[in-house]
Amino acid sequence: QLAGCIEENGINVLVVDDEFIDRVDTDIPVIIAHDTGASELPKLDKIVKNPPAVELPRFPKHGPIVLMSSGTTGIPKGIVRPEPTLPVVLASIVDTIPWRADQRLQLTASIFHTWGWACINIALGLRNTIVTRRVFDAEQVLDDVQRYRLDGMISSPIFFKRLVERDPAGEFDTSSLKFIASAGNALTPEVVKETNARFGAILCNVYGSTELALATTATMDQVAANPTIAGRVASGTKLRILDKEGHPVPRGEVGEIYLTNSTAMTGYTNPNLRLNKVDGLISIGDLGYIDEHDFLHVVGRADDMIIVGGENVHPQSVTEVLEAMPGIHEVHAGGVEDSETFQRIAVWAVPTADAAGKALTADAIRDWVRTKLADHSVPRDVHFLAKLPRNATGKVVPRLLNNDSEA
């Protein structure tokens, strides 16, 4: 992926820690950011200490920010975002979440993706103390919360699940937590239920994307009352639900989510990639609807929706149903090609280690879905895996799914 990123995005300098230098095989200049003396390549600290004699402008212009997409479907894309002149969009985060100055926070969200990167900037602006670790370890996170009496946790749903699994009975004292902020991937009803049962009803939701930053936010009370919501539209954000022709759909009807704000992307570093825009609004790539209380509900990725025998099926709904099934530790649903129905639902499940997991069968999974969803949502293919392939944000990477066991 690194070679692909360099080629597609026109990268002409690579900055690395020297522990990764053996993985680098490129034709572009390499600069060592953290050096233990093991490499003879140029060092970042020497460059900083010996700058060229260039006169800088007294009032420099803001430069664009480039963030990389998560790369779940292929090579990560370089996303160009403007630096906002006012923090209007981010105001919705501190308005929705009880995140205040001088608090102590646990940051699990990956700092090289938009959620962690945005939170670092907010935390620095609020003079927060940030506790973070190089690699996520559930026991270490729980110990950090207990030891440092942390006020908040910034993370993603898959990590909440790991925390609950490690400490369901409250062995660690986490009573200091005033909020848990979630973003990065879908916050499902089952994750909300388990997380709030362990930590109290302090889970807040933030929905957006690397391309378009913040779309909606939901308070802890709103999430507890209705775990299916993504939240209300953030301040400074314009959001519309449009059909395939780019026309607004009626309230309550599913369509593609389009939005814009002052931090929305202006383009890609790869000039060959194009934005999907309608009247200045950019598609976030998800399907959803606005309910009668102005809450946004996200039903899945626009390119994930499949048609089974003429019926629309959202794989995310199958995933959410199966997350509540005894014996399932993790699960992912998606579409595969079918010669008769054009497409069909497939499920990749990781059984639990207990008796329920050992007794789990493909037919039991199908029966569970059949009792809760329409017949066209019942998976034809069921694969049992040791674990689901995930990226640093906790998202499942579909192209890496394999069929360890099929039934």
Name the predicted role of every residue range:
Residues 14, 145, 153, 261, ...:
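AMP-binding/adenylate-forming catalytic core of the ANL superfamily
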Residues 87-104, 112-152, 166:
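Conserved AMP-binding/adenylation subdomain of ANL enzymes
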Residues 19-66, 75:
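ANL superfamily adenylate-forming
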Residues 151-154, 165-226, 238:
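Gly/Ser/Thr-rich phosphate-binding loop
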Residues 232-236, 245-278, 311-313:
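Conserved ATP/PPi-binding loop(s) of AMP-dependent carboxylate-activating enzymes
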Residues 64-88:
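Conserved AMP-binding A3 loop
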Residues 10-13, 26-42, 104-106, 151-155, ...:
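Conserved helix-loop-beta element of the AMP-binding
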Residues 83, 197, 209-228, 243-245, ...:
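Active-site loops of AMP-binding adenylate-forming
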